[in-house]
Amino acid sequence: MRVGAEYQARIPEFDPGATKYTDKDNGGMLVWSPYHSIPDAKLDEYIAIAKEKHGYNVEQALGMLFWHKHNIEKSLADLPNFTPFPDEWTVEDKVLFEQAFSFHGKSFHRIQQMLPDKTIASLVKYYYSWKKTRSRTSLMDRQARKLANRHNQGDSDDDVEETHPMDGNDSDYDPKKEAKKEGNTEQPVQTSKIGLGRREYQSLQHRHHSQRSKCRPPKGMYLTQEDVVAVSCSPNAANTILRQLDMELISLKRQVQNAKQVNSALKQKMEGGIEEFKPPESNQKINARWTTEEQLLAVQGVRKYGKDFQAIADVIGNKTVGQVKNFFVNYRRRFNLEEVLQEWEAEQGTQASNGDASTLGEETKSASNVPSGKSTDEEEEAQTPQAPRTLGPSPPAPSSTPTPTAPIATLNQPPPLLRPTLPAAPALHRQPPPLQQQARFIQPRPTLNQPPPPLIRPANSMPPRLNPRPVLSTVGGQQPPSLIGIQTDSQSSLH
């Protein structure tokens, strides 16, 4: 709905000299306007005199009264001076109007071209009277059906038509009906849209086609002989039955209203209290990757629920039961899950059964045997560094000869690798262990293919030998006497 100043029309100033609106040819004229000072009894008496004595209709009589400014005496005196225009419609006029209306519809200007002696006002007036009283079929169709029935049915139908001469009369004026209206008789008059002739025609059809045109009550309505007898037994029986039905209808409406109130109350309770009982909606998706928070939650779940992997998966939210089992198997050493499980068992007062231990061992074996592209942290921690193996025999035990310990403590290196034994070397040609220990300071990590440099006594001024003796590995811990004497001298010189 458009409301506001912007939707209001702008009215220009009044100009008395402007003659914008002119009289039109077919413009309407006001013929009656009610006046409160005239009583209804006098108005009815005036209309009756105008109709009976002077042949005026109601509209013409009221127009005369309105012309004399609602003065009844002047209107009664002026009624004989005018002859009312006869507004009669013959059968030919009605047929032409129906044809014109079927062609042009409500275009009364075009209908007037086919009926030039009729004004547009009379055409409009007749249209509304014809619209109310016309039947489903037009006048021409009814006449054609009558002729067809006469031709088919023969003399019997002709006799029926002769007994009812009003069948062919289609005029709106009926002297019998007018007499009944003016006499105000209390006899009930059965009126219908199809008229008397149509009713007789229907009765004739019903007589010949009784099964085809049987009337049935509307849908949902049932008639029984007992009800008809009960209604027709007394004049007040129908009112009594209707009153009982009204009481039943009122009680049913009351029940419907009570049911609506109960339903509305239940709906209010549901809207107010159902939110508390709704489970929280989780939109988390299953993810195979474990974050730090999820790992901590899993450890706490083992501490609280033990091996109830379903409960642990529900606590985490985005992990399945199988993923929780794999976590327990793969991370049991890293997070010390065995001790956590033992603490839970101690609290519960139960101990793990042998069946659980066997199943856990099978799971660990299957997890270790299945090749996977990913290595867990537990497997990385399980790998410990191993000492490199020596190609030759194990070195002899260190002798009691005092050696400087500061470099050994600072370097903290493994013993050097020795050269493999020569097959043709004599057993007496061996290298003393102290010299081998000294070579450790000169070259901490000799390679396998590179022999140690020749040993030179620090206090001796003698030149070194041109051909140094090759280093041989000791066999059995025995050394030649000459080397022992040299070693003894070197030890005494060091002291």
UniProtKB/Swiss-Prot annotation:
Lineage: superkingdom: Eukaryota
SUPFAM superfamilies in UniProt: Homeodomain-like
Coiled-coil stretches: 237-273
UniProt feature, compositional bias: Basic residues: 205-217
Glycyl lysine isopeptide (Lys-Gly) (interchain with G-Cter in SUMO2) crosslink residues: 20, 193, 285
Ranges of residues in domain SANT: 84-135, 285-336
Record has Hydrolase as a keyword: no
InterPro entries cross-referenced by the UniProt entry: ELM2_dom (IPR000949), Homeodomain-like_sf (IPR009057), REST_helical (IPR049048), SANT/Myb (IPR001005), SANT_dom (IPR017884), Trans_reg/Corepressor (IPR051066)
Basic and acidic residues bias (residue ranges): 162-184
Localisation per UniProt entry: Nucleus
Sites bearing Asymmetric dimethylarginine, chain numbering: 445, 457
GO-annotated biological processes: negative regulation of DNA-templated transcription; regulation of transcription by RNA polymerase II
One of the record's GO cellular component terms: nucleoplasm
Sites of Phosphothreonine modification: 376
The keyword S-adenosyl-L-methionine is annotated on this UniProt entry: no
Region of interest (Disordered), ranges: 147-219, 346-495
Polar residues composition bias: residue spans: 348-357, 475-495
Ranges of residues in domain ELM2: 1-83
Compositionally biased spans, kind Pro residues: 393-405
Main location: nucleus
UniProt keywords, alphabetically: Coiled coil, Isopeptide bond, Methylation, Nucleus, Phosphoprotein, Repeat, Repressor, Transcription, Transcription regulation, Ubl conjugation
GO MF annotation list: transcription corepressor activity
Family recorded in the similarity comment: Belongs to the CoREST family.
Protein name (Swiss-Prot/TrEMBL): REST corepressor 3
Native source organism of the sequence: Homo sapiens
